[in-house]
Amino acid sequence: MTGRVETADGKVYELPALLEWRLRRTGGVPCDSFRARCLYSAEMGEALKAACRFAATENGVTRFRGVIDEWSAVCGAEGAVLTVEGRGMAALLLDNEAEAVTYQRAALSEILKDHAAACGVAWEPRGEVYGTGEYAVASGSSRWKAIEGFARRCGLTPYFTREGVLCLRGAAEGRRLVLEEPEGVIEAWY
């Protein structure tokens, strides 16, 4: 597993070999989370001050992309170790409040533009979907709640991919997973 941090101005910095990592995927709420540890050197300090995103890749495939909540560098028995922690991209929608608004026959693209794009969240393109009647977003609601509420009215379920992209799927687009007493599995969820 390889870790990298990204700054708001688009610069990407590769982290040294990860000593430890934990990736927790939920796809929605509560949002995904991560923790990564690697050796720290003083040259990393400036990049880390501006770091806002983290990505973990394996064999060129993104396994996780999220928001950095905190980082710390500690000098101890293991040497100087950097710990980077945070949450999935859903955190941007959960942490930001929507303004009160009432839509008249809103389109999904309008809801996504108002609530996802405003937070810098990318979404998977799909055909246009229109709500029926009025759709109101209460003052103080999270942007996630604004999107999720509209999506569910339209028969869609919002979730985030491991690449940090917001997707909306209908019930017919899901997939069924069956576990028939697999040997050695103690716990499983999807």
Kindly give the residue locations of the regions a language model identified.
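A short, compositionally biased
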Residues: M1-T2, A47-C52, R152-C154
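Short amphipathic beta-strand/extended segments with alternating polar/hydrophobic composition
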Residues: V12-L18, F64-D69, E97, Q104, ...
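Surface-exposed cap/loop segments at beta↔alpha junctions
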Residues: L39-A122
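Juxtamembrane "anchor/assembly" segments of surface/extracellular structural proteins
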Residues: M1-A47, G88-A91
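Short, ordered beta-strand-loop transition motifs
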Residues: L23-D32, A73-A80, F160-E163
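Short beta-strand-centered interaction patches in the first periplasmic/extracellular domains
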Residues: G79-V81, E85-A91, P125-Y190
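Hydrophobic beta-strand residues in large extracellular and virion-surface proteins
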Residues: G3-V5, F34-A36, F54-A56, I68, ...
